[in-house]
Each structure stands twice: as C-alpha cells, then as structure tokens.
Amino acid sequence: MRTRSIQLTAVLILGLHRAAMAAPVQADKIVILKSAHSMSLLNGGKTLKTYKVALGSVPVGPKRVEGDHKTPEGDYIIDAKNAHSQFHLSLHISYPSAADQERARRLGSRPGGAIMIHGLAAPFAYLGPLHRQTDWTDGCVAVTNAEIEEIWKLVPVGTKVEIRP
C-alpha cells in the first residue's frame, strides 16, 4: 500500500513538472526601441526574447496624424489579436490614446489607427528576415511570420506596450 502511494505521488509530481515545463512563460510587457529596431518581450522585468523589427516607412519621430507613416511612441496595450490578418497574424496596439487623439485634433487632423505588430503578407513571406532591410510599414511593427507565430503564443491581450524613440 505504501509503495503504491509513493508511486502515485511520483507520477503526480512528474506530471505537474512536465505540464509546468510545457507551458511557456507569457510576456507581461513589450518594449519597442525604434532607434534600435528592436522589440523585447518581458516578464517580471526579465527579457524573454528580443526581435529585430521593421517600422513605419518614416521611422524617426512619433506618429502625429493619419497617413504620416510613423510608428507611434508612448504607452499602450495589446487590445486585440487577429488570426485572419492579411499579414499572417497580428496583435493590435491600442493607439490612439486619448492624448494622441487630442494632439491630432489640435493639428486639425485624425490620429490614424490600425497600428499592429504583424508578420508578412503571403506574397512577401518568402522574404523572411530580409524584410527588415528597410522600414516599410504604414506605422506598424513587422516581424517574420515564424516570429509572429512565436509572439502570438507569448503575448496575451492586455499586455502592456511601451514604444520608445
């Protein structure tokens, strides 16, 4: 009887250990450094993974108005995921904030929107990491399709996003 209890306990502990090992640690924050063309996923202040990224085709300076092709700067969250994106998979960044909207209003324009972290459209997927040779998006943050698949698993809706110059 005692042997059976020990065996059962060992099986349960091993099973829990394997389950814990299989579940990836999820990010609680994303930090995008525009000047370095990098995006880091963090958990508890520790870097889980860093990716090289392509940005808006006018990468210097914060996004101010719709159509300026700039990637925004500031604090946002991931507020939605799109498994049917034309860019393979995408995570929506909560731009524009109330401050972004007010700034655009003062400039007599709209702030724009649809800022995402995304992969590559099907016709360009073959480029893989070569897509990073130039900044080409309308203001989004682009990674390879393999990378967005990994990011998709690690980043839940509600994750904080900090975009720095």
PLM region spans:
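Intrinsically disordered, low-complexity
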Residues: 22-66, 160, 165
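Generic structural motif
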Residues: 19, 35, 56-58, 96-98, ...
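Bacterial N-terminal signal peptides
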Residues: 7-17
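Short, surface-exposed secondary-structure junctions/capping segments
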Residues: 61-78
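Exported/periplasmic cell-wall-interacting domains
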Residues: 23-26, 67, 80-165
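Positively charged n-region of N-terminal signal peptides that target proteins for export
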Residues: 1-4
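Structural motif
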Residues: 36-38, 75, 114
